[in-house]
Amino acid sequence: MAAQDCPVRPPVIAPATGGVDAPIVNVAPVQKILDVCRAMSLWPMTFGLACCAIEMMAVGMARFDISRFGAEVFRPSPRQSDLMIVAGTVTRKMAPALVRLYEQMPAPRYVMALGNCAISGGPFNFEGQYAIVEGVDNLVPVDVYVPGCPPRPEALLEGLFQIQHKITGRRWWPVPAEISGSMGGGA
């Protein structure tokens, strides 16, 4: 029997009532589970350009242990990452590489600007300078800003918590007392 002789059954789909295509499956609960899984298993890509990269390395050590909060392995490849941590001064010569790496990351992707240099150019941002990008947000969309020169490892962890909050819509870890006072009472 040839392939053209086989009867093809039309798909059995019930027409939607009211002229609106009703969803077949409610994926909202599944999406919530996926968001929690995504938030608790972020794979950061380090883009350490200056002093702040040292603090980023400290977060991976035993005292702070970023793996407790779901960001265990710093990935060397943008195709394996969903969080880019830009730490340090971004020069105009480095800007195209940063944008290219961001574009190679799979969606959804998140960016954290770590330190004053990544946020605004830091002490290198002065009148007449030509080599420094005045904030990484001029190149790629930034989700969380972590200020400091350099920021403490605890601040980087708080930035990670903010990204997790952005993904899931809820706070998973308590706000430390020294941070909650500066945030206006806690989350």
From Swiss-Prot:
GO biological process: aerobic respiration; electron transport coupled proton transport
Binding residue positions for [4Fe-4S] cluster: 51-52, 117, 149
GO cellular component: plasma membrane; respiratory chain complex I
Cofactor detail note: Binds 1 [4Fe-4S] cluster.
Domain of life: Bacteria
Keywords, comma-separated and alphabetical: 4Fe-4S, Cell inner membrane, Cell membrane, Iron, Iron-sulfur, Membrane, Metal-binding, NAD, Quinone, Translocase, Transport, Ubiquinone
Location relative to the cell: Cell inner membrane
Enzyme Commission numbers on file: 7.1.1.-
Cofactor: [4Fe-4S] cluster
Enzyme class (EC, first level): translocase
Membrane-topology annotation of the record: Peripheral membrane protein
Catalysed transformations (reactions): a quinone + NADH + 5 H(+)(in) = a quinol + NAD(+) + 4 H(+)(out)
GO molecular function, one term: iron ion binding
Stated role: NDH-1 shuttles electrons from NADH, via FMN and iron-sulfur (Fe-S) centers, to quinones in the respiratory chain. The immediate electron acceptor for the enzyme in this species is believed to be ubiquinone. Couples the redox reaction to proton translocation (for every two electrons transferred, four hydrogen ions are translocated across the cytoplasmic membrane), and thus conserves the redox energy in a proton gradient.
Subunit (UniProt): NDH-1 is composed of 14 different subunits. Subunits NuoB, C, D, E, F, and G constitute the peripheral sector of the complex.
Family to which this protein belongs: Belongs to the complex I 20 kDa subunit family.
Name of this protein: NADH-quinone oxidoreductase subunit B
Organism of this sequence: Nitratidesulfovibrio vulgaris (strain DSM 19637 / Miyazaki F)
Higher taxonomy: Bacteria, Pseudomonadati, Thermodesulfobacteriota, Desulfovibrionia, Desulfovibrionales
Gene from which the chain derives: nuoB
